[in-house]
């Protein structure tokens, strides 16, 4: 993408309404623009980040055996009355009426709708288990939206659901999804810690939140440093081996981890002192097991092996995709701007032409741009070198390929790594090889 033809409106000054780092940098780097309280338009570079995060989520959900679906955003109030949540949910749920005066709602979550779909589609225990998910825009009318995309009213979210014949199967699905989430966050280049959580309005008796560690996080967190070295690869844990899932879950839940709200000083004292870590965290996901709460309320049954009708056991699993964007910036930035992890960066590299209009530098930049394709943002603007450097640091792509007239004359470029700040003068092929890794 050529920056001269792109809608990436960077800002030199910090907007007054931005209170935290991620909000300031997302506005300044041209990722989003606010449309109303807690509602944002995602501009091209921001949307690329959303897509990169969502694609990692999709790949890890597929590995875990979950199927992607897409449900409507507008739901019938009758479904929520079946479960008893229509009146109980609270004012954060947007209630509307259509032209025929039928009560509808903008779904903040989808337990009811998917239970109804399963009720109409699944009749026998032979059709279970099922795991399904979607990635969709949602709306919750926060009383005081703030902190940019971390506490918005409209947000992009992955919500998943499992249906099992019995408790043992439901627990296996829960553990499978916990492993999938930990692998998802690791691929995104961030460290996440699972912590026991309240179930809130979704209900149930088992839940874990996933917190990304960030100096500016909203919650205080206490955790065992052994979380930092847990191996999550296929060699360590196989989704199809129940013993592996049990071992993974036992390992995760045997280590101390708690937010300040649930911190237990007596349990914390039992953690070896050299393994105690304190910091701040941002919640980016939560998983729930709630048994037959919805299948009973909505009369969803299947015929069991003995011919008796049974209510399937359920779980639900959420990841805040748009929230992750802000959380990752909170965890990965410096005074100059964003430092994107490789896997989710909008571009792998910024190409900086320091002598726009010079035949040699222009030709070399075009060669690099053609070689990197859609992974590169080519700063071909008629702008000062200092402005280009500042914007490249602000936008935070992993690599900067700097092309000046002296290096270009020798067929060389300067390659800067955004995270470390390391610079090296390299020939074109060597620079491209590093960027492509």
From Swiss-Prot:
UniProt subcellular location: Cytoplasm
InterPro entries reported in the protein's UniProt record: aa-tRNA-synt_IIb, aa-tRNA-synth_II, aa-tRNA-synth_II/BPL/LPL, Anticodon-bd, Anticodon-bd_dom_sf, Pro-tRNA-ligase_IIa, Pro-tRNA-synth_IIa_bac-type, Pro-tRNA_synthetase
Ligase among keywords: yes
E.C. number(s) listed in UniProt: 6.1.1.15
Main EC class the enzyme belongs to: ligase
GO molecular function: ATP binding; proline-tRNA ligase activity
Swiss-Prot/TrEMBL GO biological process terms: prolyl-tRNA aminoacylation
Catalysis performed (reactions): tRNA(Pro) + L-proline + ATP = L-prolyl-tRNA(Pro) + AMP + diphosphate
PROSITE patterns (alphabetical): AA_TRNA_LIGASE_II (PS50862)
Presence of the UniProt keyword Ligase in the record: yes
UniProt-listed Gene3D superfamilies: Anticodon-binding domain, Bira Bifunctional Protein, Domain 2
GO cellular component, one term: cytosol
Domain of life the protein comes from: Bacteria
A Pfam family assignment: tRNA-synt_2b
Alphabetic keyword roster: Aminoacyl-tRNA synthetase, ATP-binding, Cytoplasm, Ligase, Nucleotide-binding, Protein biosynthesis
Chief place where the protein resides: cytoplasm
Entry coiled-coil feature ranges: none
NCBIfam families, A to Z: PRK12325.1 (NF008979), proS_fam_II (TIGR00409)
UniProt family annotation: Belongs to the class-II aminoacyl-tRNA synthetase family. ProS type 2 subfamily.
Function: Catalyzes the attachment of proline to tRNA(Pro) in a two-step reaction: proline is first activated by ATP to form Pro-AMP and then transferred to the acceptor end of tRNA(Pro).
Quaternary assembly: Homodimer.
Record's protein name: Proline--tRNA ligase
Organism of origin: Acidiphilium cryptum (strain JF-5)
